[in-house]
Amino acid sequence: MENKQCDHLTDWFSTTSDASESMDTTPPLPPPTPSVDPSYSGAAADEDLYSDISEGDLEYSDCDSASESDEDDDDCLIPSKEKAREVAASFGYTVIKTLTPGSEGRVMVATKDGQPEPVVLKIGQKGTTLIEAMMLRNVNHPSVIQMKDTLVSGAITCMVLPHYSSDLYTFLTKESRRIPIDQALIIEKQILEGLRYLHAQRIIHRDVKTENIFINSVDQVCIADFGAAQFPVVEPADLGLAGTVETNAPEVLARAKYNSKADIWSAGIVLFEMLAYPSTLFEDPPSTPEEYVKSCHSQLLKIISTLKINPEEFPRDPGSRLVRGYIEYSRLERKPYTRYPCFQRVNLHIDGEFLVHKMLAFNAAMRPSAEELLSYPMFAQL
């Protein structure tokens, strides 16, 4: 990147999204609202909350060639493959393919007599899958996956979802190259439009990542997999761990209070991965759920070290867990709110780098909302 651009970025990055450091507020929730059981807090124990640690959620595996261990993978949340196929058949569906299961249930591509278009069935225990289904039933936006139907058989809930050709992770892997800036901005705009809508409904997704962005084409993208979503959230709250460590925001990793700004951080990681493929900001993801929980501390240290977070970029609240636990690891060699040095190695387009930098503001109060980001010139002109 030319020095002229670097100087421009430094000036650009010295500004913040808002004059104040108060978290954004969202408008009241319009009816209808998800009818979630009042006894459900949505904040389970840390070790139970990592809802999806798969890579390439839409990677296909032949139904008849699945590993034997997969057959035995039926714990209290995931029905066995045979049971899931029986449930699908009882509703008139013929399973074509099985997809990588999440922790909430089996995922299968299926067709129904008289309906040639394939659909995706997400089949799981009623408690967890039904909560996700009730949430999706009450949302309606082109950038959020649309639930076609909810079917119940005993203790099993089956969600019927549209079938997309790929997820963004698989799309990037197959393309094996960076997505051009104009296409990446079109995709990111749809993601942010979906988040703006969800946040206005007081829903935070909590697991925005390339695996959970479904795509048919550059201009047909949606946010999917609401197994980790939380409702209702406006003010920062103690919501526990959820999602995926390498895309979690600092405040989530620190187990501090957080709100919708956590989704903005994750969407910033998605944009970076589109523009910098195959480079990633934070390498070496853990491989087991236990390692995910244990690695929150090391991941947060990695963020501070990689981005060279200045102490002035920490939240102003001295009682914040992020401040109390991690400000001692901050770095002084980089001035606050200036370009992250690690961006130099990937040579991002200036518009893309500006957006990623804004979305990866370490202090959530300085992170723009989806509404603010969509007002930026690079999106307004699309």
UniProtKB/Swiss-Prot annotation:
Residues 12-24 have a biased composition (Polar residues). It comes from the Viruses. GO terms for cellular component: host cell cytoplasm; host cell nucleus. Phosphorylated by protein 49; this phosphorylation regulates subsequent phosphorylation of proteins 26 and 29 by US3 homolog. Autophosphorylated. This is Serine/threonine-protein kinase US3 homolog. Belongs to the protein kinase superfamily. Ser/Thr protein kinase family. Keywords: ATP-binding, Host cytoplasm, Host nucleus, Host-virus interaction, Kinase, Modulation of host cell apoptosis by virus, Modulation of host chromatin by virus, Nucleotide-binding, Serine/threonine-protein kinase, Transferase. Pfam families: Pkinase. Its EC number is 2.7.11.1. InterPro entries: Kinase-like_dom_sf, NEK_Ser/Thr_kinase, Prot_kinase_dom, Ser/Thr_kinase_AS. It comes from Equine herpesvirus 1 (strain Ab4p).
